[in-house]
């Protein structure tokens, strides 16, 4: 199972979790066009509130796990293919269960990741695929650093 792949294999330098993160990055990048098209000029008070909550919690150097999950799920809800939503949720669950075992995230990483959420949503709302991809890269940078 994905969870066991992320948790076990102690001698593999977290290879299983890196594999999962790489698939999440690939999926997020593959969904750039549908996400930016679905959200272009779209108002959503729920996502606005989630982004504000994420930034507020991160500024206190606290984890924003619930808000993070809701953000990623809400971002994909307008897409026609709900399998994307289910895959993202499965990968998100594995990654949030296993990342604390790495001693991550560091406080400064939480702030950077919170900012990346705002950048992802801002780019999606602007319909800016290039900025969205850059924000996805920023979103995963702290996690990838913790895995190397």
Where are these regions (language model features)?
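Secondary-structure edge/capping motif, primarily at the C-terminal ends of alpha-helices
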Residues: 34-38, 54-61, 124
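C-terminal all-alpha effector/ligand-binding and dimerization domain
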Residues: 48-56, 70, 89-148
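Short basic (Lys/Arg) and small-residue
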Residues: 75
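Acidic, Gly/Pro-rich loop/turn segments at junctions of secondary structure
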Residues: 12-14, 59, 79
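Amphipathic alpha-helix face/heptad-repeat signature
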Residues: 16, 20-23, 43, 50, ...
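Short linear motifs at protein or domain termini
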Residues: 1-33, 37, 148
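Short, cationic motifs built from Arg/Lys/His that form the positively charged side of catalytic pockets
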Residues: 24, 28, 38-39, 72, ...
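Short loop-to-helix capping motifs
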Residues: 80-82, 127-128
